[in-house]
A protein has these predicted regions:
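Hydrophobic, lipid-facing residues on alpha-helical transmembrane segments of integral membrane proteins
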Residues: 54-70, 163, 167, 171, ...
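Charge-rich cytosolic interhelical loops and cytosolic tails of multi-pass membrane proteins
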Residues: 73-147
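Short, charged low-complexity linear motifs
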Residues: 121-123, 195-198
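Intrinsically disordered regions, especially transient/low-confidence alpha-helical propensity segments
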Residues: 21-23, 133, 215
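N-terminal first transmembrane alpha-helix
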Residues: 1-100, 185-192
Length: 218
């Protein structure tokens, strides 16, 4: 059986382990205390390790909880930064305007195949996007069990969830700096890593979403 979200047990888990490792290394005094440990501060070092471990667990759980509480629609809006439309909302307009670049099909063939849909698209932006997405979704329902569609959808959902997890970790880390100032240190390089990962995953999500949408219609 194909597990659409098996990546949550692999890629998402690996990402969380990476972020927690960097958090321990750069944002807590654990490693510094371990390197300078002696008989007189063994207890202090142990206490620091326990505090850092607890806070790491809190950050991890908070990130996962955020991901679970955020709806799929809100995730899509976050990916689009609240102003970029989903690919399914513009796919037929993009074909009509020659903005689709996909080596798997010619634009002229796609124009011929979906002429009926394009002819009934209204000029008003919101209504047009709603109709385009509805038409695309009807096509998706017919081919959702197709292997190439399943694979492209999995890739898209994986990148989207990696982006959301990184964004959630970024937010809870910033909060933890203010909530646990005695244990959590501000690290500019960790913040940069989180920002870079967020941007990279966002770009990947858009690329995979576009690939998924065009795979459905062809």
């Amino acid at each position: 059986m194909w597990l659409m979200k098996e990546y949550r047990n692999k890629e998402v888990r690996d990402l969380m382990l990476l972020l927690l490792s960097l958090f321990w290394l750069w944002c807590t005094p654990v490693f510094h205390n371990i390197c300078s440990v002696d008989d007189q501060n063994n207890f202090s070092t142990l206490l620091t390790i326990l505090e850092s471990t607890t806070i790491s667990a809190v950050l991890s759980c908070a990130s996962i909880l955020c991901d679970c509480l955020i709806s799929s629609a809100l995730k899509d809006k976050l990916v689009g930064l609240f102003f970029m439309p989903r690919s399914g909302e513009t796919i037929f307009s993009d074909i009509k305007n020659g903005q689709i670049k996909d080596s798997r099909f010619r634009t002229s063939d796609a124009l011929s195949l979906y002429t009926g849909i394009m002819q009934k698209l209204p000029n008003e932006k919101a209504a047009r996007r709603e109709i385009e997405n509805a038409e695309w979704y009807q096509i998706y329902q017919r081919y959702q069990e197709k292997g190439s569609v399943i694979q492209s959808q999995r890739d898209y959902l994986m990148c989207r969830d990696l982006f959301i997890e990184t964004l959630a970790f970024l937010i809870v880390y910033i909060l933890s700096v203010h909530i646990f100032p005695s244990v959590v240190c501000f690290s500019l390089k960790f913040l940069i890593v989180l920002f870079v990962l967020s941007i990279a995953f966002n770009i990947c999500t858009h690329l995979k979403m576009s690939r998924f949408v065009t795979t459905v219609i062809w």
